[in-house]
Amino acid sequence: MCDLIEPQPAEKIGKMKKLRRTLSESFSRIALKKEDTTFDEICVTKMSTRNCQGTDSVIKHLDTIPEDKKVRVQRTQSTFDPFEKPANQVKRVHSENNACINFKSSSAGKESPKVRRHSSPSSPTSPKFGKADSYEKLEKLGEGSYATVYKGKSKVNGKLVALKVIRLQEEEGTPFTAIREASLLKGLKHANIVLLHDIIHTKETLTLVFEYVHTDLCQYMDKHPGGLHPDNVKLFLFQLLRGLSYIHQRYILHRDLKPQNLLISDTGELKLADFGLARAKSVPSHTYSNEVVTLWYRPPDVLLGSTEYSTCLDMWGVGCIFVEMIQGVAAFPGMKDIQDQLERIFLVLGTPNEDTWPGVHSLPHFKPERFTVYSSKSLRQAWNKLSYVNHAEDLASKLLQCSPKNRLSAQAALSHEYFSDLPPRLWELTDMSSIFTVPNVRLQPEAGESMRAFGKNNSYGKSLSNSKH
């Protein structure tokens, strides 16, 4: 079903520290031209096509970095207690660090923007790219723990961009989340993955320049409450699975799937974004943190302390997002603590045991006496709108499996009967081709939407009027 991403042996941990120093120091040596190959040497350059277990991937090392250069990268020890109540209740908030505009603040009291004809984002080619003065900041979109995102404009070609400005601290070096995101995205070219245009490094900041994307799925669902048009759900889900299949085939996990990390362009394209927590097997790590996915979209195996991650980790999030798009509410909106989150899952899927989930008793935080014993129920009993859409309940049930080994992979999900009424050409597209280049593939107006919001010049007919956990 899904590919296992195994933790690395303990003796390789030293390599991780060396890699962090190498990558962090390397940012100060990046030439200011986008086409410079120095940064490529930092990235994963070859991924084996063999089964993920036992895969040896190749990283090019930078022999030019002096060994006496000590670049400290902050490491924090996790104090995660899965049953400790958080200081505040979990609440739905919009993303502050993805490459999109805050829809509510920009569109209140206005008509939904008209859609534009689809066009693939163009990569900068001018030698002026890579320079800090090549971009103009237009407005602040959000701020996270280590980065601030601005809407910007290229002074070279006038295109809108999203500027993710990462603050550097001399004593700590470059944040490793930034290194991960930049190094992974540099090698990912797909219509359903946000495009990294440029990298700008100064003494104080590291700026990642992304294509500008109009909104995100969270804001889109907030704009259209009560569940999305079934046809639109299908197209969004298809694009999500396309993007995931692409990265999973390269043994990369996203690890932070949630609606606010799924960007929606004004042509209807869905793009995976925010790869700060993404992990490639080629980056050595003794264990993976279990504090990686927002609570509502975190799979039960991770909640129970498993660190043996596979691509199935992402597939649980897909199932949660699928249900949320159809039903109009989060699938498992835990409000108290980890225990409450697990109870909400078990209430629908049944409390696991060794018969239904072999190995569950060996998970660090599984204590049978802590949980009420529930029997599983059909998903339509929990989310009635699944019954209105052909094959939706069956697909959701194959994604929302407590045992990770039983979850459908992204590639297998794309072949599910739920998608059988889509044009066959969608499965023949090249990686960088949008699904909206296929005739008659278009988003439908959401309930209550004014037809004036749909561009008359849209070559695909009716299309998108745009609008968390």
Swiss-Prot record:
Keyword Transferase applies: yes
GO BP annotation list: cell division; G2/M transition of mitotic cell cycle; regulation of canonical Wnt signaling pathway; Wnt signaling pathway
SUPFAM superfamilies: Protein kinase-like (PK-like) (SSF56112)
E.C. code: 2.7.11.22
Residues covered by the Protein kinase domain: 135-419
Modified positions (Phosphoserine) in chain numbering: S24, S78, S95, S134
Pfam family, one: Pkinase
List of catalytic residues: D256 (proton acceptor)
Record-level GO cellular component terms: cyclin-dependent protein kinase holoenzyme complex; cytoplasm; cytoplasmic cyclin-dependent protein kinase holoenzyme complex; cytosol; nucleoplasm; nucleus; plasma membrane
Enzyme superclass (EC): transferase
Expression sites (tissue/organ): In the adult, widely expressed at low levels except in brain, kidney and testis where expression is high. In the brain, detected in cortex, hippocampus, dentate gyrus, amygdala cortex, parasubiculum and cerebellum. In the embryo, expressed predominantly in the nervous system.
Stored CDD domains: STKc_PFTAIRE1 (cd07869)
Cell location: Cell membrane; Cytoplasm; Nucleus
Coiled coil: none
Keyword Phosphoprotein assigned: yes
Biased composition (Polar residues): 456-469
InterPro entries (alphabetical): CDK, Kinase-like_dom_sf, Prot_kinase_dom, Protein_kinase_ATP_BS, Ser/Thr_kinase_AS
MF annotations from Gene Ontology: ATP binding; cyclin binding; cyclin-dependent protein serine/threonine kinase activity; protein kinase activity; protein serine kinase activity; protein serine/threonine kinase activity
Keywords: ATP-binding, Cell cycle, Cell division, Cell membrane, Cytoplasm, Kinase, Membrane, Nucleotide-binding, Nucleus, Phosphoprotein, Serine/threonine-protein kinase, Transferase, Wnt signaling pathway
Protein family (similarity comment): Belongs to the protein kinase superfamily. CMGC Ser/Thr protein kinase family. CDC2/CDKX subfamily.
Described purpose of this protein according to its UniProt entry: Serine/threonine-protein kinase involved in the control of the eukaryotic cell cycle, whose activity is controlled by an associated cyclin. Acts as a cell-cycle regulator of Wnt signaling pathway during G2/M phase by mediating the phosphorylation of LRP6 at 'Ser-1490', leading to the activation of the Wnt signaling pathway. Acts as a regulator of cell cycle progression and cell proliferation via its interaction with CCDN3. Phosphorylates RB1 in vitro, however the relevance of such result remains to be confirmed in vivo.
Protein name: Cyclin-dependent kinase 14
